[in-house]
Amino acid sequence: MKILVSACLLGRNCKYNGGNNHSAAVIDFLQGHEVIPVCPEVLAGLGTPRTPVEIVQGEVKTKDGKSVDKALRQAVAQILEENPDADCAVLKSRSPTCGVKQVYDGTFSGKLVDGMGVLAQALKDAGYRVIDVEDLP
């Protein structure tokens, strides 16, 4: 199987704070599969570390109000275009790009709401199986 994976889950330091979300469960799940690391924020040129972003009324913005929506959506489109034969995606929970079940509410207060990040939603809309990392066995 060819699996798209949030790069931070593989130990890449691409989180907004310069860290990662390395997950032994993800590494175990991926054994024997072709792995494609993805980080829309880095692909969009947002850098690491970077100002946090959240979805604010449908638009991805930085904490200081700058829209990065166009760049992120272009990065998402590129990921889909370059990986038409991926079988599924394992994505980081609560991320504004990768969140599968919940994302932060856009107030930068730490409050969660039901919803999907822009990459997760685009993958789902394109018919990919999208898995929240927290749902792995």
Regions found by a protein language model. Give the residues of each.
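N-terminal glycine-rich phosphate/adenylate-binding segment common to multiple enzyme folds
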Residues: 78-107
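General beta-strand structural signal in soluble alpha/beta enzymes
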Residues: 37-40, 89, 131-133
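Extreme N-terminal starter segment of soluble prokaryotic enzymes
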Residues: 1-4
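Short, surface-exposed acidic-centric catalytic microdomains
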Residues: 21-61
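Short amphipathic alpha-helices and their capping/turn segments at secondary-structure boundaries
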Residues: 22-36, 74-89
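Divalent-metal-activated hydrolytic enzyme cores
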Residues: 43, 52-55, 60-83, 111-137
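Short beta-strand segments
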Residues: 6-7, 39, 90-94
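Short N-terminal binding/cap micro-motifs at the start of the first secondary-structure element
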Residues: 11-18
